[in-house]
Design a protein with these regions (language model features):
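Phosphate-interacting basic helix/loop segments used at nucleotide- and nucleic-acid interfaces
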Residues: 1-14, 66-67
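Short hydrophobic/charged patches on amphipathic alpha-helices used for structural packing
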Residues: 4, 126, 204-205
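P-loop NTP-binding catalytic core
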Residues: 17-134, 176
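Glycine-rich, charged/polar anion/phosphate-binding loops
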Residues: 67-69, 80-85, 166, 202, ...
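Switch/coupling sub-region of P-loop NTPases
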Residues: 132-141, 153-279
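Conserved lysine of the Walker
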Residues: 145
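Conserved P-loop NTPase
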Residues: 271-300
Length: 300
């Protein structure tokens, strides 16, 4: 396939195709001064690109058609694939986005070496994780939330049991006692099939029966936060990621619909680790944990 080379490159983080007549673009971990790099890979026609994305979908056991023009799936290697087919929902035609995840877990030592965390921040988060606290890694999109979350999980003692719940399995954990659950979507099949969907809320409740020491949700967006809060109250270590620009914005999002977290439940959260992309001296961009904010009760 035309994108075989970037797919095999472990330093390529994202591959994007916005139209058949535009060059394939990618995000590269070693060239952080650029947002997107344009390659010399192009497709000759819309039909060629459609045929390719259909073959790609079939390799994952799914289909993408004019009747079902949106597909969100995962490759056998664990990479996330998003496709829009033809011009049913996207202009000017078929588009593709592939998010490639590291094949091996990134350790805390690596995160410190790359400057994502200072040694003091790392020590604090390590202690909080070992003590089974409730940690939310928050930040905007593509700011390194999942990478930081994965590195925190490597600090958990190997004798502890970890349960992860995700829409798309992204986390890689070097633990023998690791239970990984993922959602099942029946979108686009039929209205009756929606009864067989398995969402994050149901998975978090199911995970409690596996007696994990830690429950990890890839990202909270809805009612699964209720089950996660209950798990924290029961003494489980809880970690998750969340989209927010600041601790104040995170708290505001948690308070309003569809999350609607009661004020008292916010005190269960130990801290927010805030990540973002920052521009360094020389123009390069890097992901950094900029702040660790603890939740403190207001004085009455």
């Amino acid at each position: 396939e035309k994108i075989h080379v970037p797919m095999m490159d472990p330093d390529v983080e994202e591959i994007g195709i916005t139209a058949w007549n535009k060059p394939v673009a990618l995000v590269h971990r070693r060239f952080t001064e650029y947002d997107w790099l344009f390659t010399n890979i192009t497709y000759h026609s819309e039909d060629e690109l459609r045929n390719f994305v259909q073959r790609l979908a079939q390799k994952t056991g799914k289909t993408v058609t004019v009747a079902k023009p949106i597909l969100d799936t995962m490759s056998r290697e664990g990479d996330r694939i998003a496709i829009t087919f033809a011009d049913e929902v996207s202009r000017p035609g078929t588009t593709l986005a592939i998010r490639k995840f590291p094949r091996e877990p990134l350790t805390m030592a690596y995160i410190i070496k790359t400057g994502t965390l200072t040694p003091l921040m790392a020590a604090y988060l390590w202690i909080m994780t070992e003590q089974k606290k409730y940690i939310i890694v928050a930040g905007p999109m593509a700011s390194g939330k999942t990478t930081l979350l994965g590195s925190l999980l490597t600090t958990i003692p190997p004798t502890r049991k970890i349960g992860t719940v995700e829409d798309t399995p992204e986390l890689r954990i070097p633990h023998e006692q690791w239970e990984s659950l993922k959602t099942r979507s029946m979108w686009g099949v039929s209205e009756e099939a929606s009864a067989f969907e398995v969402d994050l809320f149901g998975l978090v409740k199911a995970m409690l029966r596996f007696r994990p020491d830690y429950i990890v949700v890839g990202e909270v967006r809805g009612e699964e936060i209720v089950a996660l809060n209950q798990a924290a109250l029961l003494g489980h270590g809880c970690l998750t990621t969340f989209h927010a620009e600041s601790p104040e914005a995170a708290l505001a999002r948690l308070r309003v619909s569809p999350l609607n977290v009661p004020e008292g439940h916010l005190l269960i959260i130990t801290c927010f680790a805030m990540t973002n992309r920052v521009q360094l001296h020389g123009g390069t961009w890097a992901r950094r944990c900029l702040e660790i904010a603890e939740i403190e009760p207001k004085e009455s």
